[in-house]
Swiss-Prot record:
Record-linked Pfam families: NAD-GH
Catalytic activity reported: L-glutamate + NAD(+) + H2O = 2-oxoglutarate + NH4(+) + NADH + H(+)
Keywords: Allosteric enzyme, NAD, Oxidoreductase
Name the record gives this protein: NAD-specific glutamate dehydrogenase
């Protein structure tokens, strides 16, 4: 990704650099696209009539400044992100009354626009006449550029405006006189591209160019190709500025006019300064030129508000000559006219006007129509208009008054003292330059241009460079990295995986309907087709309700048929023969009756009704096990732990092909007097009889204690029924767990229901059965599903249909159930066949829903190997990366005055070192080789201390200081919905459950002493743990009444103590 960002930045810079010549030639400047577009939008919103007026001007063909503003804004908003908009009056041959209206609208609404520009808006305007705005330059900068304008200068610029109120409003604007100015009204001080480098390199460039001209002046073969002819007539001297042929090809017209106008303005200003020093001004002999709609300087300069009387010390005899100066501009040409109104005593005279234009040929035409060629290189010396006075006026009776431009350039800054060189009439012959000199001059011209434009790219102002870097980084990281790689990439993956998802708002509806992820639609089909519990009958009417997830291989296929919402929570399982199914449906339970639960301060039992796998005959493949009603979670394994006495008694089979049962119990010296046992009475009774005679489901008045819980396995004999039912109703076993209803405190009971079908009818010590599935003596099994942690069981119907069932094997350990379940929301999960890393785990839900993506959560647990020899097995292999059990004890004390960190473990069955797993997509950018430590949590989850620290209660920062461990520290939090509790969390990183039981701290037991939510730590100071026993507490679940799909925010302000509302 970093490489892509770098390439994008390089590409972006190259694009800008490739267009830098175009940008510079158009006198455009870099500006933020967001500011510019927002400014334009607000401008047009504030001036809708201006927008409409601009359309009318474009339709009428008036290429005035308003139309240029309108068209250029629309073009740049559509195509460019970075630009500076410069509006030039391309054609001023029309009446500009509408332009004046546009200027009023623009200035009137400018205070409304300026606050939305997100930065100082430098608005520079050349007001060259009283009724027309000739140039409007909108420039956006990342920093302020103070032109040092005074109120008097601003008033001088605004004074010709016909709207005095508007001028006063602009002058008195508070923004105008602060450091962060939004509005500037001043004359253009820098021409073209040199505006960008004025702050840094303008002076240096000017000196270098001046030095270059001085060198060229001394070269005899590179004399300026400047030729003038003797003036033989009286009349008008006109300077005609025409396009250079190359300029017409490479430069757009609006740039040409902008450059010409600004340059001519600067030149004429200097001319007027010279004229005013030599002429006597008279105010009563002015002759305006109303027919010329051009650069009307009469109202701009005081010198042109009066007649210009010729006079001075140059030997001219008459003092009554008047001179009028005006401009006339068309789309292609600009004419500069100096008219001698009354020249009775002037035989000849001329004014040489070197008009400085970049990359153009300035042709000076006098009344004799003799051309004068001026090199375009002269433009390069214009680096500051206000410090360059390079035009001189030379007159002499009956001779041409002229000088070389090099002489004028050499006298920059001192035009009044430079002495021109006069030519005689014989010298005034046309002299064409040689071809080699022209080629060399063009070559030098291109070299200078390349040097200067290269300097522009390098020597930009720091503010502009900073803006460019910041904007490019924002574009790269936000537009490219975030939008392209994250948003679009993930969206594309999601679009491929989840093409058909029907969802509603979980907060409004209460649950989400999904065709694939949840089982509401599937369960509805079950209801329609007769799918029901506790009723004798064939639930699979058309043989497809249990085939939501079918694999390609019969050993790994699973059929899911969920009958209710049963939280299996902290039950255990093994790793062998895991399935590859993905995204099972989730049952939505609308409500329950009132149930009497066990108080949280008391011990609860793990009630498990499973059929353990009987590894009869010690074969590798024991086919499919018989239906067993055993409650012994140790099943056929001798799980041995420290100071525990797990008894297991083999019971003879009543009938070889009917029932295989095991009677297992946990004789651990628990406080209660009841074992986890099997009630076989219901096996010989019909379902209806048991329900009518034994169950009392309607008495809700009294409370129950530990012995009032009834666990019945209901079923029916199937010895003879299998011979007749065939397709309609093969023998089935229905297991019912009934709660005696009542009001009272709610405890937690974990009920795991599993039903099996006896396919293992082999007669000898063989590995596979060959005849049992073809005798129509079995029925499709139904069972719960734990994704990725189940044993696939093969079931064959008589009709030949393959249906897979999920069988859960449970292995108990001594105490403390570590979890590595897959009960997490907001996770994109792909279950694969793998080891389950966790000896004791929790089954949160039968069906897990994955909704939101972009959160990587690992729910891998681990357990011991599934071995062939069932008589001598110890669950010794653990779940850490290097192989050991996942039992850790973390202790956090209550007070935090003098807290220290103990780097040793209280009791650990894991390896000493193991690598951290990347559980959350490397959000914290940290992977370390860490220890499993015992924390003295006085400092609230601080892993190390230096001295006596005081730590606020809720000041927890999830940064690199919070190190995430593997499943040895399996603490997580689950978003609670209704009465579904959020599991305990330590720093809120992993998404794995952590079971906590309350016991006395004695020797010989493994007790976890930390309880915590997202930001608070809950400590059980008084615990109760006995010696040499195995007791499983499940203080972490409740009935799931609204576990549809709603998300609720965890309580972060919960008090740091254990309450009955801990769910």
């Amino acid at each position: 990704m970093l490489l892509c960002i770098v390439l994008f930045l390089i590409f972006h810079i190259l694009i800008n650099q490739a267009g830098i010549v175009h940008v510079l030639y158009n006198a455009s400047f870099v500006a933020s696209s967001s500011r510019f577009i927002l400014f334009c939008e607000e401008l047009f919103k504030a001036t809708p009539q201006y927008w409409q007026w601009g359309n009318s001007i474009v339709q009428n063909g008036d290429a005035s400044i308003a139309s240029t503003l309108y068209l250029t804004m629309r073009t740049f908003i559509k195509h460019w992100k970075y630009t500076l908009l410069i509006m030039i009056n391309q054609s001023i041959s029309y009446s500009c009354y509408s332009t004046n209206e546009a200027s009023h609208l623009l200035f009137t609404n400018l205070p409304k626009v300026a606050p939305y520009t997100l930065g100082p808006l430098n608005f520079e305007c050349c007001l060259l006449s009283s009724h027309h705005i000739r140039h409007i330059v909108l420039m956006f900068y990342g920093a302020n550029i103070d032109h040092g304008l005074t109120k008097y200068e601003l008033y001088t610029v605004c004074r010709p405006s016909s709207d005095e109120k508007l001028c006063n409003k602009i002058l008195n604007s508070p923004r105008l006189h602060t450091h962060n100015r939004y509005l500037y009204l001043t004359e253009v001080r820098i021409v073209g591209a040199f505006y960008l480098i004025k702050q840094v390199g303008a002076r240096m460039v000017g000196l270098l160019v001046h030095l270059a001209f001085m060198v060229l002046q001394n070269l005899p073969k590179l004399i300026w190709p400047l030729d003038l002819v003797h003036v033989r007539q009286k009349g008008t001297c006109t300077a005609h500025i025409a396009y250079h042929p190359l300029a017409q090809k490479h430069f757009p017209p609006y740039f040409t006019h902008f450059y010409l106008n600004v340059t001519i303005y600067a030149v004429v200003k200097n001319i007027l300064d010279n004229i005013s020093s030599s002429f006597t001004l008279q105010s009563n002999r002015v002759r305006p030129r109303p027919d010329v709609a051009g650069f009307d300087f009469f109202h701009r300069f005081d010198a042109f508000e009066q007649s210009l009387t010729y006079g001075g010390d140059t030997g001219i005899t008459s003092s009554n000559e008047k001179v009028a100066l005006c401009f006339e501009a068309t789309y292609t040409d600009i004419f500069f006219t100096v008219e001698i109104i009354d020249s009775t005593s002037v035989d000849s005279g001329a004014i040489m006007l070197p008009i400085l234009v970049d990359a153009y040929t300035a042709v000076a035409r006098n009344f004799c129509s003799v051309s004068m060629v001026i090199s375009p290189l002269v433009t390069l010396v214009v680096y500051d208009i206000y410090t360059c006075s390079f035009i001189g006026l030379c007159t002499q009776r009956r001779t041409i008054n002229c000088t070389r431009i090099l002489d004028a350039i050499s006298s920059v800054g001192n035009s009044h003292t430079f002495l021109p060189r006069y030519k005689s009439p014989r010298e005034l012959t046309t002299r064409q330059p040689s071809g080699s000199s022209v080629i060399l001059l063009i070559f030098l011209l291109l070299g200078f241009e390349f040097f200067l434009f290269s300097g522009l790219v390098v020597v930009e102002p720091v503010n502009d460079v900073g803006d460019l870097v910041v904007n490019d980084l924002l574009v790269a990281f936000i537009d490219l990295a975030l939008e392209l790689f994250v948003v679009e990439g993930v969206a594309e993956v999601v679009g491929v995986v989840f093409k058909t998802v029907l969802g509603f708002n979980a907060d409004v509806v209460g649950f989400i309907f999904r065709l694939v992820l949840f089982s509401f639609l599937h369960h509805a089909f079950n209801i329609i087709l007769g799918e029901a519990t506790l009723v004798v009958g064939n639930g699979n009417l058309v043989f497809f309700t249990s085939r939501l997830f079918d694999g390609r291989h019969v050993q790994d296929t699973v059929g899911i048929n969920v009958e209710g919402d049963i939280n299996l929570w902290n039950t255990t399982r093994h790793w062998r023969n895991t399935i590859e199914g993905e995204l099972p449906e989730q049952v939505v339970v609308t409500g329950h009756r009132t149930l009497t639960f066990k108080h949280l301060n008391q011990h609860t039992r793990l009630v498990v009704s499973v059929g353990g796998e009987s590894l009869r005959l010690l074969g590798w493949h024991s086919s499919v096990t018989l239906d067993e009603g055993s409650h012994d979670t140790t099943s056929s394994f001798q799980t041995k732990r420290e100071r525990s006495d797990i008894k297991k008694q083999q019971v003879l089979e009543l009938f070889r092909r009917v029932v295989t049962a095991q009677n297992g119990s946990l004789d651990c010296g628990t406080e209660s007097n009841s074992f986890i046992r099997v009630d076989r009475l219901a096996w010989f009774l019909a379902v209806e009889e048991v329900r009518k005679q034994l169950l009392d489901l309607w008495d809700t008045g009294g409370t129950t204690d530990k012995d009032d819980f009834m666990d019945l396995a209901l079923g029916e004999l199937r010895v003879t029924e299998d011979l007749f039912n065939r397709f309609h109703s093969l023998a089935e076993v229905v297991t019912a767990h009934v709660f005696e209803t009542g009001t009272g405190d709610g405890g937690v009971e974990i009920n795991t229901i599993e039903e099996r079908v006896d396919f293992n009818v082999s007669l000898g010590r063989r590995r596979k059965s060959t005849l049992g599935t073809f005798t129509s003596g079995t029925k499709t099994a139904k069972g719960t599903l734990v994704l990725g942690h189940i044993l696939a069981v093969l079931a064959l119907e008589f009709s030949g249909k393959v249906v897979d069932e999920a069988v859960i094997e449970i292995f108990t350990t001594q105490v403390g159930i570590t979890s590595s379940s897959l009960d997490f929301e907001d996770t994109f999960f792909n279950g694969q066949k793998r080891h389950i890393e966790g000896t004791t785990t929790k089954i949160e839900n039968e069906n897990i829903a994955f909704t939101t993506l972009l959160v990587k959560t690992v729910g891998n647990g681990g357990t011991s190997r599934f071995v062939n020899d069932t008589k001598d097995v110890k669950t010794s292999n653990g779940t850490s990366i290097l192989g050991s059990l996942t039992l850790r004890v973390v202790e956090i004390s209550w007070d935090g005055n003098d807290s220290v960190v103990n780097s040793s473990t209280n009791e650990g069955f894991s390896n000493f070192l193991h690598l951290d797993q990347n559980h959350r997509g490397n959000f914290f950018r940290l992977e370390s080789l860490s220890f499993t430590l015992e924390f003295d949590g006085d400092l609230w989850l601080v892993t190390s201390t230096r001295g006596n620290l005081e730590w606020p209660v809720l000041n927890i920062g999830l940064s690199s200081w919070v190190v995430e461990f593997t499943t040895d520290q399996t603490l997580s939090i689950e978003h609670s919905v209704g009465r579904v509790h959020g599991n305990l969390v330590l720093s809120g990183i992993t998404n794995k459950t952590f079971a906590v039981s309350e016991s006395n701290v004695r020797w010989g037991g493994t007790v976890t002493l930390i309880v915590g939510n997202n930001f608070n730590t809950i400590v059980l100071p008084d615990t109760d743990t006995r010696i040499s026993r195995t007791e499983i507490d499940t203080d972490g679940s409740s009935l799931d009444t609204r576990h549809a799909c709603s998300k609720f925010k965890n309580e972060v302000d919960s008090p740091p103590h254990l309450t009955s509302a801990f769910i």
